[in-house]
Curated annotation (Swiss-Prot):
This is Cytochrome P450 2D6. Substrate binds at D301. A cytochrome P450 monooxygenase involved in the metabolism of fatty acids, steroids and retinoids. Mechanistically, uses molecular oxygen inserting one oxygen atom into a substrate, and reducing the second into a water molecule, with two electrons provided by NADPH via cytochrome P450 reductase (NADPH--hemoprotein reductase). Catalyzes the epoxidation of double bonds of polyunsaturated fatty acids (PUFA). Its main location: endoplasmic reticulum. One of its GO terms (cellular component) is endoplasmic reticulum membrane. The gene is CYP2D6. GO terms for biological process: arachidonate metabolic process; cholesterol metabolic process; retinol metabolic process; xenobiotic metabolic process. Belongs to the cytochrome P450 family. Heme binds at C443. Keywords: Cholesterol metabolism, Endoplasmic reticulum, Fatty acid metabolism, Heme, Iron, Lipid metabolism, Membrane, Metal-binding, Microsome, Monooxygenase, Oxidoreductase, Steroid metabolism, Sterol metabolism. Pfam families: p450 (PF00067). It comes from Pan paniscus. It is a peripheral membrane protein.
Length: 497
């Protein structure tokens, strides 16, 4: 084919692509559609978004366009919601209409399918309801909110304190030990087992979980989701979700081993056994979400999300204690007054410890570890803050804009536990405290996370005083964004009290 023949073909293809692009842009011209930066042909606003620091980028766009603004990622329409009023209106007032998740084409690489979507990324429908109901009821049956699970956590907290004590007051990074302790609670719930802190396979699993969550953000990921036809290019598809694939492979080995010890005649000892029991009941039902493929994804959801978010919050907590020794001393005084230095902390103590409770909540607010939450999608046309958002629009809920809202918090960019105390020193929780999101897709692990944060945090401060190592500079209080916001690397000294 000569060059002369290629020219008209190129013109036809170009016109076709421009028409397709025009079709995807047309909603921008609809009445009351949210404003936003002008999208480029084909790419949309992909080049306008800094995926290495998306929260900051969204904050800058909010200053230009307001609390509700629009983007177009290739041909995917997106609306970003900022501030308490907009976020609550979308997720609570229109809860049924915003409970869906947008399609995530790259998850096909991990084995996602119509009946195997896990819990967190599952589309809003029968499969999600089935798994949400199962997860909540199973966690409750395994002891969530009861003394049995509380005892698991306090025993793991004792192991964590012993590991801290092994450093004999010398400088070390606490993140790894925090990961291990929190992961053992999740492993007990999901697989009925506890790992030693130096178990090589356990360490590998934790590394893969950490790296896998970092793959939840990035330019290439967004491009492949926006233009899924590119997934057919092996060189591109092979570059994404490598750690998540390796994590699932490691998890498959644990689940295979666990199946060999399962006795269907006995009550389930953990979530995996409860899931296997449901699979037996669902045999012959092709519509059931209880299947081998979904088992691995549900367990992976609970393991990775439950481990990394809680351990990261604890890492923020210890960092803020060494940066604010006055706050640390006041927490320790309250621990000494209510619990003493011998008895293990219990959840029943929390009601008598308003300052410690306020500090933990302020750690969550200031750390702001999941700044953009998980994306939602509208299942019908809705109106938010006077703007019309069409059906099928992807929603980013900027939780950071709520947790750092200058109209709500007295000192939004400073660590200030008094945000959660009234004039009499009683604990109060403002409406804008939404680290677990809100509405129908709010984090199902919130009760477990609250228990772990209180018991691990109070156990550590009961046994140790934390400080910046002598001769080292004061650590930064700025975080590092990679889907989650983690503290900048730091060391501390844990001196027994």
């Amino acid at each position: 084919m000569g060059l002369e023949a290629l020219v008209p073909l190129a013109v036809i293809v170009t016109i076709f692509l421009l028409l397709v692009d025009l079709m995807h842009r047309r909603q921008r011209w609809a009445a009351r559609y949210p404003p936003g930066p002008l999208p480029l042909p084909g790419l949309g606003n992909l080049l306008h978004v800094d995926f290495q620091n998306t929260p900051y980028c969204f904050d800058q766009l909010r200053r230009r366009f307001g609390d509700v603004f629009s983007l177009q990622l290739a041909w995917t329409p997106v609306v970003v919601l900022n501030g308490l009023a907009a976020v609550r209106e979308a997720l609570v007032t229109h809860g049924e209409d915003t409970a869906d998740r947008p399609p995530v084409p790259i998850t096909q690489i991990l084995g996602f399918g119509p009946r195997s979507q896990g819990v967190f990324l599952a589309r809003y429908g029968p499969a999600w309801r089935e798994q949400r109901r199962f997860s909540v009821s199973t966690l409750r049956n395994l002891g969530l909110g009861k003394k049995s699970l509380e005892q698991w956590v306090t025993e793991e907290a004792a192991c964590l304190c012993a590991a801290f004590a092994n450093h004999s007051g010398r400088p070390f990074r606490p993140n790894g030990l925090l990961d291990k302790a929190v992961s053992n609670v999740i492993a007990s719930l999901t697989c009925g087992r506890r790992f030693e802190y130096d178990d090589p396979r356990f360490l590998r699993l934790l590394d893969l979980a950490q790296e896998g969550l970092k793959e939840e953000s990035g330019f290439l990921r967004e491009v492949l989701n926006a233009v899924p036809v590119l997934l057919h290019i092996p060189a591109l598809a092979g570059k994404v979700l490598r750690f998540q694939k390796a994590f699932l492979t490691q998890l498959d080995e644990l689940l295979t081993e666990h199946r060999m010890t399962w006795d269907p005649a006995q009550p389930p000892r953990d979530l995996t056994e409860a899931f296997l029991a449901e699979m037996e009941k669902a045999k012959g039902n092709p519509e059931s979400s209880f299947n081998d493929e979904n088992l691995r994804i549900v367990v992976a959801d609970l393991f990775s999300a439950g481990m990394v978010t809680t351990s990261t919050t604890l890492a923020w907590g210890l960092l803020l204690m060494i940066l604010h020794p006055d706050v640390q001393r006041r927490v320790q005084q309250e621990i000494d007054d209510v619990i003493g230095q011998v008895r293990r902390p219990e959840m029943g103590d929390q009601a008598r410890m308003p300052y410690t409770t306020a500090v933990i909540h302020e750690v969550q607010r200031f750390g702001d570890i999941v700044p953009l939450g998980v994306t939602h999608m509208t299942s019908r046309d809705i109106e938010v803050q006077g703007f019309r958002i069409p059906k099928g629009t992807t929603l980013f809920t900027n939780l950071s804009s709520v947790l750092k809202d200058e109209a709500v918090w007295e000192k939004p960019f400073r660590f200030h536990p008094e945000h959660f105390l009234d004039a009499q020193g009683h604990f109060v929780k403002p409406e804008a405290f939404l680290p677990f999101s809100a509405g129908r897709r709010a984090c199902l692990g919130e009760p477990l996370a609250r228990m772990e944060l209180f018991l691990f945090f109070t156990s550590l401060l009961q046994h140790f005083s934390f400080s910046v190592p002598t001769g080292q500079p004061r650590p930064s209080h700025h975080g590092v964004f990679a889907f989650l916001v983690t503290p900048s690397p730091y060391e501390l000294c844990a001196v027994p009290r």
